[in-house]
């Protein structure tokens, strides 16, 4: 018989014995026996002499007796503690006497990230559906790490309103650290959702236009991504300084932005997720061997991601099994991901479509207050913003050098509070009515849903306030005086026409024309 598996009854006498055979006593039992065995009472009063002798003794030696009692109690308590600790230690010559814990250790060591992680095969797995439209997803535990211990030099990769990015170029990794704990949960869930959509889109539709995470740390509030060569803003500056006329550059641009447009449509329509923060700084690029042409471009930074009306997981939950916990850690769907926010939609105004700027000027915000974001709105906003980033490249790299004048995509910068103002919204709408007709392609391909560019009368017709209408008209007249003659002399090479057609469709004034890209 295997003696190691035998169990004693709960009331067995051996249950009160230590591994060394001595009976275990509580502190209360020990103190009682000590007091009874002491020749003096617990109060320090002698038991033998009379009350008069006791009074004399207290008056002459009370302090000595009290101090002596305290010392004996302190010494006895120390011996009792030592005996208790020795009882807990198993005898070295007795096999199998180590005390077994009835609970797991307080904390098991988790894995630190010491080597560059590989791309995961999956990020989320549907485990069950608790209620109608309340799925529970298990997060791939292989993505979780405690600390980042990958060797290599760190360099500054960028900073934003929600976090900072460090680059480990030796291993081609980018580590984003979120500043606030509350916002980290929002961005982590958004990143995991988009990452799972990216993996599925790559397998089923060969769409790879979004960056996918490689790992994350709850303790450090970090998310690890693959590093790219630079963002689109830096690439535009580099390309403008080269003044290249190589047709392969525009061809690669057209391919990459077409891929990005497909990714935006897939994310909004199939996954029910709108990015809402597409700009040059959030598009990462990788160059070919010539260090000029694009090899790949992906959308990054999911800080403002919002689930639109096509999503079926707005009430979803996420669980992560950690080594130091018996039950998995649960995450609910953050509210910031499920409700529309007009301030988020409008942003700074640089890349927002005209219909959204008109709603801002008319103060039409009811449809965006505590409501789900409509799919067609999210898709129209994302596609227009993508077209504006491509227009930024065309103006900076091709238009401005050909004119010899620093023409920009928008009329100017905001200096007050870095927020959209009615004055700047009017300036944007009026400036586009002059810039877009000079660059957009006017053809049957782009005019299926009407003119691709904005005209003053079309904007003016939708403005409700007469004062705002007059201000808009004045702005249009001013920009026609200052820019129309210059822009009329723009002459771009014919190999740029596919790129301009794509800009015209992405930034079409009619949202339905943008939806037609899907």
Curated annotation (Swiss-Prot):
Displays a substrate specificity similar to host CDC2. The active site is at residue 277. It is found in: Virion tegument; Host nucleus. Its EC number is 2.7.11.1. This is Serine/threonine-protein kinase UL13. InterPro entries: Kinase-like_dom_sf, Prot_kinase_dom, Ser/Thr_kinase_AS. It comes from the Viruses. One of its GO terms (molecular function) is ATP binding. ATP binds at residues 157-165, 176. It is an enzyme of class 2 (transferase). Multifunctional serine/threonine kinase that plays a role in several processes including egress of virus particles from the nucleus, modulation of the actin cytoskeleton and regulation of viral and cellular gene expression. Regulates the nuclear localization of viral envelopment factors UL34 and UL31, by phosphorylating the US3 kinase, indicating a role in nuclear egress. Disrupts host nuclear lamins, including LMNA and LMNB1. Phosphorylates the viral Fc receptor composed of glycoproteins E (gE) and I (gI). Coiled coil: none annotated. Residues 1-119 are annotated as: Disordered. Changing residue 35 to I: In strain: Nonneuroinvasive mutant HF10. Residues 151-518 form the Protein kinase domain. Keywords: ATP-binding, Host nucleus, Host-virus interaction, Kinase, Nucleotide-binding, Serine/threonine-protein kinase, Transferase, Virion, Virion tegument.
